[in-house]
Amino acid sequence: MSRLARLREQLSTRDHFCDGWLLVATLSLMLIGWVMVTSASTEVATSLTGNPWYFSVRHGVFVLCSMVVALLVLRIPMAWWKANGPLLLLVGLALLALVLVAGREVNGSRRWLSVPGIPLNLQASEIAKLCLIVYLAGYLERFLPQVRRHWGAFLRPLMVMAVMGVLLIFEPDYGAVVVMTGCVMGMLLMAGAPWGRFLLLMGLVAALGAALAIAEPYRMARLTSFVDPWADQFASGYQLTQALIAFGRGEWFGTGLGNSVQKLFYLPEAHTDFVFAVLAEELGMIGAVAVIGLFALLVWRAMAVGRRAELAKRPFAAYLCYGIALVIGAQAFINIAVSTGMLPTKGLTLPLLSYGGSSLVISAVMVGMLLRVDIETRQARRREQPAAPRTGEARS
């Protein structure tokens, strides 16, 4: 056996209870997120509340609650999610409609629902993402041949996404629209839908996006500031230029944990949407690449869990894993791309890292579902394998 083969055997989690690398990536990102939220929020917390650890303590509570919720989700069989997919979709749509009526407005967007007695604002779009994935996974299991052959079955989930998209645009939450649309199209593509349909739909989506951008002056301002943020660095390009300064200050190894200058009221949303810029400033390019590597590991293992489920003839579980991997991967990519100036500002959190209870809890729920799929698949595989004969029986 070669060295590479031995190393792969040592790193393999094939005979373990669950995918250990998925757990390592998730827990590492949550821990790094807590540390970075603490570092990035001390000055803002002092200014707003007089307590420098206000956001750190709250985020720590969110982390603990997320772990508890993930453990509870781990006990729910996939059969329950499969049976309740349509109901969960209705819950997601109801929350998106409710937030337009009774939602709390922050920075011009009505995205949050206040829950009496709980110091947590629920972000409706985060719950809707999960509900949509569960519904679509069940839909693909039931109508997979029709999705591959007929336009009607192919367009049905896209029509559901269109309804959600309209509700999200009214909030507005364009970042969630992009992530959820990409997730739906990605799941349909992985289910074997023809490429030609995607090319046509991508053209239509691009045309619609251009029309929406032109319709509102502030959207055009975001696009132009993204192309050249330095042209208006104290107005429309301010947030992006400050993020780029943070990346530049970090260089290779960073300024050191807690030594960020940009978090001192220069970079808005330093502990939420732009926490990755503060991370790059304090931990440098090495730290930033390491975090990107952890996200890549998480998405890879989620896809691997889905592939094992697909090979075990468990299509619902497989498509659920693919959808979760697409959502986490797309949201992480967009957030990092926005921070580095590759994409216009979207207002998306960085999963498992950014401050925010709803995002963290839903991300933990998704990981709990991945682990549940993995455990069920491994148990099914062990049941199918013939039991090894006992020593006495082997001799006889």
Swiss-Prot record:
Q: What is its main location?
A: membrane
Q: In which pathway does it act?
A: Cell wall biogenesis; peptidoglycan biosynthesis
Provide the E.C. number(s) assigned to this enzyme: 2.4.99.28
Where does this polypeptide localize?
Cell inner membrane
Q: What class of enzyme is it?
A: transferase
Keywords attached to this Swiss-Prot or TrEMBL record, sorted alphabetically, are: Cell cycle, Cell division, Cell inner membrane, Cell membrane, Cell shape, Cell wall biogenesis/degradation, Glycosyltransferase, Membrane, Peptidoglycan synthesis, Transferase, Transmembrane, Transmembrane helix
List the molecular function annotations (GO) for this entry.
Answer: lipid-linked peptidoglycan transporter activity; peptidoglycan glycosyltransferase activity
Which BP terms in the Gene Ontology apply to this protein? cell wall organization; FtsZ-dependent cytokinesis; peptidoglycan biosynthetic process; regulation of cell shape
- Give me the segments passing through the membrane: 17-37, 61-81, 83-103, 117-137, 159-179, 198-218, 274-294, 316-336, 350-370
Q: Does Cell membrane show up as a keyword for this record?
A: yes
Q: Name one GO cellular component term.
A: cell division site
Q: How does it sit in the membrane?
A: Multi-pass membrane protein
Q: Which PANTHER family match?
A: CELL CYCLE PROTEIN, PEPTIDOGLYCAN GLYCOSYLTRANSFERASE FTSW-RELATED
Q: What role is this protein assigned?
A: Peptidoglycan polymerase that is essential for cell division.
Spell out the family assignment given in the record's similarity comment: Belongs to the SEDS family. FtsW subfamily.
Q: Output the HAMAP family linked to this UniProt entry.
A: PGT_FtsW_proteobact
Q: Name the chain's protein.
A: Probable peptidoglycan glycosyltransferase FtsW
